Amino acid sequence: MTIHLVVIDALNLIRRVHAAQPGEPDVKNTARVCCQALSKIIKFSEPSHIVAVFDHHGDDRGWRAKLLPHYKEGRKPMPPELQAGMEIIQDAFMDLGIDSLLSDGDEADDLVATLALKVASRHQQVTIISTDKGYCQLLSPTLRVRDYFQQRWLDSPFVEKEYGVKPEQLPDYWGLAGISSSKIPGIPGIGPKAALELLSLYPDLDTILQAEDLPTKWQKKITKHRESAEASKKVASLKTDLTLGFNLQDIRYLAPSS
């Protein structure tokens, strides 16, 4: 059979829907609106397999915070009523025929990336539903990223327009320029413009760090902050080698009987 796997970045969807509610937040209403969105996604994408991937709810901030202690520091925590109602939302997803997968200590991003790449590398179609541009580093002819809220594809032309680099260069770009919203520092004094210029001269961060002919204006900064650049690139890179404790058959999409 032809496979089309749709992977939902669950909290990316849920938190945006919940925050957009007028008046007092209501988890049941959040679940209802999310299910309306998912029904549209299913109709639009016609998946053969589908799964919603959730972050774990533990206190462990994960391997990225061990490399960069300030990683994602200061972000608003999940509203308590939303965290308490997560089971209600997951049950509503299941009623639509969408199983939920919890990351169990790994960031959901890495679990999404591992699953998506495993299927896409077998020349089967994968669509990730998320506004997170970090997934764009995975783009390939068989792997797409869809921003549901903006109704647009985060594809190669989007990446080139937004950043000026190829999708596979994004971790190198972020290793240089950083990501301020995630407290990923990159190299102080190297902003988007300089990062783009460097990646037009050299193919990746490793080559930049080893180059003996670096333009003088950047030499000192890059030499001084080499470790920050390497850690930033690693944190911005998605892991794609996690162990998956299930197979595709477990997430096959079966439309619920009306």
From Swiss-Prot:
Binds 2 Mg(2+) per subunit. Only one magnesium ion has a direct interaction with the protein, the other interactions are indirect. The keyword Cell membrane does not apply. InterPro entries: 5-3_exonucl_a-hlix_arch_N, 5-3_exonuclease, 5-3_exonuclease_C_sf, DNA_polI_H3TH, FEN, HhH2, PIN-like_dom_sf, Xni. Keywords: DNA-binding, Endonuclease, Hydrolase, Magnesium, Metal-binding, Nuclease, Potassium. Its EC number is 3.1.-.-. The keyword Repeat does not apply. Its cofactor is Mg(2+); K(+). Has flap endonuclease activity. During DNA replication, flap endonucleases cleave the 5'-overhanging flap structure that is generated by displacement synthesis when DNA polymerase encounters the 5'-end of a downstream Okazaki fragment. This is Flap endonuclease Xni. It comes from Photobacterium profundum (strain SS9). The gene is xni.
